[in-house]
């Protein structure tokens, strides 16, 4: 397809190149350009996006994927709108909560896709992940203030990882990967971290949502569970959030002091939410009545 204009989009952590392209009929599209080494993973991602789109999920629907020389080009519908993270606070708390409920409903649809791949049981797989992150954290020259609380909690609560189901995951599900369209609807974007795992692990990045909008984060949980949140969810959510934050400091190290400070601040906030892990439901969680 020939395009009359091509504007680079410089956002996100992906090493893919992203563009807003326009054809000769002034129709806009989203173009993602990847190295040809990623062809197989990009084909899988494209296939998964087609399946998600077929469920009626609001998103940049996939149109085509092809190898162009040394590059993989995947073309998607364009959404006119703004990043949810930048616009969510311009609407009422009730509307923030409603957007969160919709995000939870979308996630439940994504998790309904049938999984045919064989996968190792979740408990041994995730325990290795915890061990690896704790090891790297202990080797890290920088530490969190009171970081040992995270490690002690993880080691004392691994039993909850038993017998967990596994589903297809979006892989990076938080407020930074949503857009609010000009039609005021919410759209999910950035499917390039698709994975398999415990459906509830998908909430491990809800920290980013809660820091921006507790109403959105709370709505996401209520929407996913249709207002019936099981006790086990809170136990596992704490494990998944803490595993992430323990692994975040060694990850941030190469990016420098600014990124390290972001993670140290997040670790401090997590301890405040959980009162040094003495309570299991984070303090930002608002049920439907208090969100309104």
Where are the model-predicted features located?
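An alpha-helical support segment within catalytic cores of ATP-dependent transferases
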Residues: 1, 112-171, 222, 263-277, ...
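A general structural signal marking secondary-structure boundaries and capping sites
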Residues: 56, 66, 82-83, 107-115, ...
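Glycine-rich, phosphate-binding/catalytic loops in enzymes
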Residues: 92-93, 187, 204-207, 265-266
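Short beta-strand segments
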Residues: 30-33, 63, 168-171, 188-190, ...
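ATP-binding pocket architecture of kinase catalytic cores
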Residues: 8-121
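Active-site acidic catalytic loop and adjacent metal/ATP-binding pocket
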Residues: 17-22, 154-203
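Short strand-connecting beta-turns/loops that link adjacent beta-strands
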Residues: 24-26, 67-70, 182-185, 242-245
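Helix-rich C-terminal or lid/interface subdomains of diverse kinases
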Residues: 16, 101, 162, 205, ...
